[in-house]
């Protein structure tokens, strides 16, 4: 039985990795072994940062809500507690959007929260 050569498979694998490494600087986009290391590391970063993105956005929303709440004379924690007691079920993403784009409606929510405290 003849020896099975892996040239086609290897070339496909190399091309796939080098295609993923496009845009990297220097040897990281030219040499297979170095490109492969960088692509693997990049995929690890991508996985990690997809998880971190959720935390980052939640922090951003809380910061925006807190700033808008303090402009209306109440702290973030008291606002959230007041909204919970009032039965207002609105998430932080929507609250932050409202704080930035519709200050009047956010002010009404603050009044509702203050009334329930």
Curated annotation (Swiss-Prot):
Listed Pfam families: Ribosomal_L20
CDD domains reported for this sequence: Ribosomal_L20
Keyword Ribosomal protein listed: yes
Keywords in alphabetical order: Ribonucleoprotein, Ribosomal protein, RNA-binding, rRNA-binding
Example GO biological process: translation
GO MF entries: rRNA binding; structural constituent of ribosome
Gene Ontology CC terms: ribonucleoprotein complex; ribosome
Family: Belongs to the bacterial ribosomal protein bL20 family.
Physiological role: Binds directly to 23S ribosomal RNA and is necessary for the in vitro assembly process of the 50S ribosomal subunit. It is not involved in the protein synthesizing functions of that subunit.
Full protein name: Large ribosomal subunit protein bL20
Gene: rplT
